[in-house]
From Swiss-Prot:
It comes from Biomphalaria glabrata (Bloodfluke planorb). Binds and precipitates antigens of the parasite Echinostoma paraensei. Hemolymph. GO terms for molecular function: carbohydrate binding. Coiled coil: none annotated. This is Hemolymph 65 kDa lectin BG01. Induction: By infection. Keywords: Lectin, Secreted. InterPro entries: Fibrinogen-like_C. The keyword Nucleotidyltransferase does not apply. SUPFAM superfamilies: Fibrinogen C-terminal domain-like.
């Protein structure tokens, strides 16, 4: 699941990182 925020950042729901959210610029 990838969510694009209003600021243009992308949050990726990944199970490889403790099931947390990783933020990409």
């Amino acid at each position: 699941v990838v969510v694009t925020l209003a600021s243009g950042l992308e949050m990726c729901d990944t199970t490889t990182d403790g099931g947390g959210w990783t933020i990409f610029q």
